[in-house]
Every structure is written in C-alpha cells, then in structure tokens.
UniProtKB/Swiss-Prot annotation:
Organism taxonomic ancestry: Eukaryota, Metazoa, Ecdysozoa, Arthropoda, Hexapoda
Domain of life: Eukaryota
Subcellular localization, as worded in the UniProt entry: Cytoplasm, Cytosol; Cytoplasm; Rough endoplasmic reticulum
GO biological-process terms attached to the record: cytoplasmic translation
Keywords associated with the record: Cytoplasm, Endoplasmic reticulum, Ribonucleoprotein, Ribosomal protein
Region of interest (Disordered), ranges: 86-115
GO cellular component terms given for this protein: cytoplasmic side of rough endoplasmic reticulum membrane; cytosolic small ribosomal subunit; ribosome
Pfam families: Ribosomal_S26e (PF01283)
Family listed: Belongs to the eukaryotic ribosomal protein eS26 family.
Protein's UniProt name: Small ribosomal subunit protein eS26
GO molecular function, one term: mRNA binding
PROSITE patterns, per database record: RIBOSOMAL_S26E
Organism expressing this protein natively: Anopheles gambiae
Amino acid sequence: MTKKRRNGGRCKHNRGHVKAVRCTNCARCVPKDKAIKKFVIRNIVEAAAVRDISDASVYSSYVLPKLYAKLHYCVSCAIHSKVVRNRSKETRRIRTPPQRSFPKDMNRQQNAQRK
C-alpha cells in the first residue's frame, strides 16, 4: 500500500507506545507525538486595559505578567482552526518547520537581557 508520509503522521520512531494527551479544543485523546503543539504567550491583561493599569501602578517599571500555555490539538481541530494546512504532495516532503514569529515585546526583552 502506498504511504502518504514518511513518518506516518507521527514522531514515534521505534518507541512502541506513547502516552495520550487531550485535545484542548474537543478533548479527544491523541498520542502525544501525533498531536499538533502550539505554544502561546499572551498578556494576562487585554491590550485596551494595559495603559490604564500601567498608569495606575505604583511601580514605574512594573512589567505585567504573561500567560504561557502549551496547546495540544488533534489533527482535525488543527486543520479546522487553521493551525496547520494540508499541503501538496511535493511540499509534504519538506520537513523543516516554518519560520516562527515572536511577539515584538518578547524580542525586546531578550535583547535587553543580553546587553
């Protein structure tokens, strides 16, 4: 039978069994290596209220904390919510992950720490 993907849609090479995780969207059990993972960094406070809170803050250089969440999606939810797209036969062979884009404030913080 023909094979659609070299890895069979998984990352479990010579492992036998991998524990399951729950999809954050539909709660379906998905093997951890097959689940599509997305790491999300968000401000706890919404963008409209950031300025009000920083003005009301007693501390001048107080940085608002962020929410860090690792989301696990099953394949169908990841396609439906446009986290991933189905690709043509030629582009399916490209195994390098796409270029990651980071929030602008995160890049500024990393540059400040290096200096």
